Amino acid sequence: MQKEIVMTEALRRKLINAGRVLTSQDQGDFVAGHVTVRLPDDPGRFLMKPATIGLEEMTFDNIITVDLEGQKVGGTMPRHNEVFIHSEVLRARSDLQAVVHTHAPHAVAFSSLGRELVPVNNEAGYFYQQLPVFSETSDLIVTQDRGKGVARCLGRHSAVLLRNHGIVTAGRTIEEAVWIALKLERACRVQLMAEWAGGPKFVAEGEDLQKKNARGNRPDLYTNVFNYLVRMWCRDHGKADDPCCAEHHVQDESAYQK
């Protein structure tokens, strides 16, 4: 029991930091947007950012617990109406542990063009021909049926564009789900820049694309980028003594020559 409590506290810290990271990278939208993580000892339930607050305002005390029916089973604050994005993706994909939904502005703008995301920059290669677009509605996902539709659209992928709405990303860890959200927004932003300049004339392809994808999708990057952005947030906000900041000074050096 003590081990489970410690593990849940660690997940709460990561969830808090995920909200801080997403906001610091301009994926906050006032009190919209949410991130979740499955409870390892109870896979039918997950921790979730509550409604009515910003992503960066999560604390140990206000995070809520929700089941796969979308019902709040723990916590005092209200749950988001779009809970079904998370409950249905986690129900459909037992391999996934974390889900992010934001109204990432460049991704929303890009989704309105009806164009394919192509490998203009390093990040975009990850999504090339691997980025489904959910177009059943551009409205909020406030029913189980709509949530199931998002989960079907996601399929075996790790990201989906919600047309004229936002993004959904998912991963085996919080760090991975956040990293994919950051990569997708950056890829959309860079392609929009190319479109504004007349459209991309050159993109990565063939062996170059394969090598870039292999390097850009290493698990150590999920951890190192997440930890870096947490440290940056803590420095910028004078929170060096915050317990949520303390554990992010370790780097994963497994992919580098010593």
Question: Residues of each region from the PLM?
Answer:
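Glycine-rich flexible loops
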Residues: 1-258
